Amino acid sequence: MQVTETLNEGLKREIKVVVPAKDLEAKLAERLETARDRAKINGFRPGKVPAAHLRKMYGKSFMAEIVNEILNDSSRSLLAERNEKSATQPEVIMSEDEKEAEQVLDGKADFVFSLNYEVLPAIEVKDFSKIAVTREVVDISDEEVDDQVKRIASSTRAFETKKGKAENEDRVTIDYLGKLDGEPFEGGADNDAQLVLGSGQFIPGFEEQLVGVKAGDEKVITVTFPAEYGAAHLAGKEATFDITVKEVAKPNELVLDDETAKKLGIESLERLRQVVREQIESQYGQITRQKVKRQILDALDGDYQFATPQKLVDAEFNNIWQQINFDLQQAGRTFEDEETTEEAAREEYRKLAERRVRLGLVLSEIGEKAGVEVSEEELQRAVYDQVRRYPGQEKEIYEFLRKTPDAVANLRAPIFEEKVVDHLLANISVTDKKVSKEELTAEDEDAASEAKPAKKAAPKKKAAPKKKADEGKSEEA
């Protein structure tokens, strides 16, 4: 096998490989000899089939197998010999000349192909012990826990039909028919819909206009859908709703005791408070970690500047761009609606993709040098969590993951990254700072502008007054 480097520019490489016909012929002869010992062909005794006959019957198929084996093995072995790591699977380039291919399969021509690839850049891990980050910490008050317990427990309250006008916290049962310009719109009608006034379940302005209604009332209300509403044909539009009030019910007094907790599947009120506190701690903890992680990544971003493999950047950009366009399409919005242009958005998101790839390579190198590993137990837990996301398709998803190494690698990557972050946190300066929950949950404007140069479109919701559109999540960089 003759190997010649034909391209070496930056991270780009191309090598030309020539496998002489005599080497192919030697491999074929070995395979034919092995096959002769096992071949059962009418008219010949076992092991006595002439090589020429076997070659006539199986020569081309055997040679095709040999060629494929060379292609499969060469990428790994040749890069190992060159002490290089390819950023992606090398591209195999072969002649498209059918006559030449036939000659190779007949053993009459050298097998020539090229491998085109990008190498991973060499990264020297720098001293990161001087990195300093601030970890925002929120003290969770008993009052906050109690408020959340009350909100959760309120779902267990029974309602009792009342006479008279509806007030906030009363439940109204209504039929409604939504109209745009006097014409009913898809998804804008419902019967026996139950709505607790003041819950914020419906769009702004809807519930407020039902305060004071009585059973039997018929009323037309006018509302304006939020500009970011998920259903594009309703976003920002004024609509009317014909309302028929069928019942007004008042909530029974909320009692917080062990019986209420048991209705929620928890053994006691004290345990409910504990569970709620743990949930709040977990929510705040996730926000805190993301903010700390961003500080670490920003510090690493300043310390590591190098060329990144363009194929990795292209793949990352395509993933981001696909999601952004999906979000915009679902919301029925354009880049102009988000006060930007497609060209500007592409430029910003490509920068984000390049940063992600570069920092991913840095974290990978830091983790490798530190001996960070993902255990089989951690990986199996991730597989289990992934399978659980598809009720009714568990077997199919599990089989897909079992047969698709790349899919499992995608599950492994975030686990590895978080373990590297843990390693960094244990070796850098971390200062805790007590903040309010409002300060903790306030959006980081710098992070938001980097993650989404265009305002992130809201996901699509049902074309009805129910639920305000959720804000999209920013991209982690």
Swiss-Prot record:
Any one cellular-component term (Gene Ontology): cytoplasm
Main location group: cytoplasm
InterPro entries per record: PPIase_dom_sf, PPIase_FKBP_dom, Trig_fac, Trigger_fac_C, Trigger_fac_C_sf, Trigger_fac_ribosome-bd_bac, Trigger_fac_ribosome-bd_sf, Trigger_fact/SurA_dom_sf
Residue intervals of the PPIase FKBP-type domain: 169-254
Protein's cellular compartments: Cytoplasm
Coiled-coil ranges from the UniProt annotation: none
GO terms for MF: peptidyl-prolyl cis-trans isomerase activity; protein folding chaperone; ribosome binding
Superkingdom in the source lineage: Bacteria
Comp. bias intervals (Basic residues): 454-466
Keywords: Cell cycle, Cell division, Chaperone, Cytoplasm, Isomerase, Rotamase
Biased composition (Basic and acidic residues): 467-477
HAMAP family: Trigger_factor_Tig
Family: Belongs to the FKBP-type PPIase family. Tig subfamily.
Domain-related comment: Consists of 3 domains; the N-terminus binds the ribosome, the middle domain has PPIase activity, while the C-terminus has intrinsic chaperone activity on its own.
Free-text function comment from the UniProt entry: Involved in protein export. Acts as a chaperone by maintaining the newly synthesized protein in an open conformation. Functions as a peptidyl-prolyl cis-trans isomerase.
Protein known as: Trigger factor
Gene of this entry: tig
